[in-house]
């Protein structure tokens, strides 16, 4: 059996990642605040074109490896890994608007129940976002943690350091 994975955001990045991880044998739950999107995804209705994605979603649903919810409580408490794949639209000044990342980290922190999963940020965000208090302090409060950050396009990881 694979890892238990939560993917926060079921848009272009999150949905493709969730379906791919489910195909690899992981138990994946994708969370999105868009209720209509979740209702559609539970019926394998993918709202954008990505070659082969509908088939992957159908297979994931049929195998029981892929789940969709609008509730963090259904995805976070048992997750070994959490991928953040939320929208970060540009502000009027052109910088990334990190409100969705902040909101997601607060929601994650509220459902961790003492567990300390590895959290990977796949959202488009400036270098060092994982080190900023607005992004990581809520998750790191009263928990020994280490922040590992890559300065290239890959990802930022907030992880255990026990």
Language-model-detected regions and their locations in the chain:
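Short, well-ordered coil/turn residues at beta-beta hairpins
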Residues: 78, 84-86, 122
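Rossmann-like NAD(P)(H) cofactor-binding subdomain of soluble oxidoreductases
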Residues: 90-137
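Low-acidity, Ser/Thr- and Arg-rich intrinsically disordered low-complexity segments
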Residues: 131-136, 141-145, 149-155, 159-162
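NAD(P)+-binding Rossmann beta1-loop-alpha1 motif at the extreme N-terminus of oxidoreductases
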Residues: 1-45
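A structured beta-alpha segment of the ubiquitous adenosine-cofactor-binding alpha/beta core
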Residues: 53-80, 90, 109-113
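N-terminal glycine-rich phosphate-binding loop for ADP-containing cofactors
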Residues: 8, 20, 65, 75, ...
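Basic, amphipathic N-terminal segments that precede the first structured/catalytic domain
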Residues: 33, 45-59
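A structural alpha-helix within SAM-dependent methyltransferase catalytic domains
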Residues: 19-22, 76, 105, 109
């Amino acid at each position: 059996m694979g890892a238990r994975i939560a993917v926060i955001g079921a848009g272009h990045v999150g949905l493709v990642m969730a379906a791919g991880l489910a195909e690899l044998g992981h138990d994946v739950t994708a969370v999105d605040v868009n209720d209509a999107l979740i209702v559609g995804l539970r019926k394998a209705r993918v709202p954008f074109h990505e070659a082969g994605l509908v088939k992957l979603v159908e297979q994931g649903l049929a195998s029981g490896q892929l789940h969709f919810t609008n509730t963090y409580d259904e995805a976070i408490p048992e997750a070994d890994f959490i991928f953040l794949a939320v929208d970060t639209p540009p502000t009027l000044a052109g910088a990334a608007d990190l409100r969705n990342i902040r909101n997601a980290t607060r929601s994650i922190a509220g459902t961790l129940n003492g567990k300390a999963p590895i959290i990977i940020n796949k959202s488009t965000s400036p270098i060092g976002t994982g080190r900023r208090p607005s992004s990581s302090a809520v998750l790191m409060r009263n928990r020994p943690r280490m922040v590992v950050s890559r300065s290239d396009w890959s990802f930022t990881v907030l992880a255990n350091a026990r």
